[in-house]
């Protein structure tokens, strides 16, 4: 996807949820620069990060509920009766999530959108704030992956 098309998609999405006037240039630029698939560990993603998208949290829908259609982070839908993704679907999810990650950056959208503002998150994410602290175990797992660690 050309960089200008990714920026246009990010702006259109922000406008759709009523935040176009406040979308920062940094967020638009981040949308235009997808991470390289060679920089973040696929196996860590598949085994540790991807299950987070299926986890039910009190007061919130599972990430997959909204992120399987109509959002910039588009995960593969799970067929009825299945509770995990197959290898092909996991690779597609990995590629989709790379679009919201800048390897080594704590400002990656994957980290800041679902994090409470008072914990360092931003005001985006119409699905609510899933983590109130950067000390949350799930958020720490996401951070570990984004920072390039495999532990």
Tell what function each PLM region has.
Residues 15-151:
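Aromatic- and Gly/Pro-enriched helix-to-coil junctions and flexible linker segments
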Residues 6-16:
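Bacterial N-terminal signal peptides
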Residues 1-4:
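Positively charged n-region of N-terminal signal peptides that target proteins for export
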